[in-house]
Amino acid sequence: MIREERLLKVLRAPHISEKATMSAEKSNTIVFKVAKDATKKEIKAAVEKLFEVEVKSVNTLIIKGKTKRQGLRQGRRSDVKKAYVTLNEGQDLDFVGGAE
């Protein structure tokens, strides 16, 4: 069993983009930014516990940080790990829905 403190640190934020929105509408998939060391099992447990939904599958990927320049200084943005969480049929999770 994964500790509750760890589950709270696994999910960083929902990733909201045009692709993520189309994915949510088309295949019931939600996209999250997650901790770099998070496993698929931890991500699944965190989503199921925090949002009380059933998760069908979890796919992860790491986006490499871009190299950026400002004048003569050169730096690099941090790498980011994203998780595509597919929910079971009939499950719904809405982050961008309008407030009433």
Swiss-Prot record:
The keyword Ribosomal protein applies. The keyword RNA-binding applies. GO terms for molecular function: rRNA binding; structural constituent of ribosome. One of its GO terms (biological process) is translation. Keywords: Ribonucleoprotein, Ribosomal protein, RNA-binding, rRNA-binding. Gene3D superfamilies: 3.30.70.330. GO terms for cellular component: ribonucleoprotein complex; ribosome. Disulfide bonds: none annotated. PANTHER family: 60S RIBOSOMAL PROTEIN L23A (PTHR11620). Part of the 50S ribosomal subunit. Contacts protein L29, and trigger factor when it is bound to the ribosome. One of the early assembly proteins it binds 23S rRNA. One of the proteins that surrounds the polypeptide exit tunnel on the outside of the ribosome. Forms the main docking site for trigger factor binding to the ribosome. Belongs to the universal ribosomal protein uL23 family. This is Large ribosomal subunit protein uL23. It comes from Vibrio cholerae serotype O1 (strain ATCC 39541 / Classical Ogawa 395 / O395). The lineage of its organism: Bacteria, Pseudomonadati, Pseudomonadota, Gammaproteobacteria, Vibrionales. The gene is rplW.
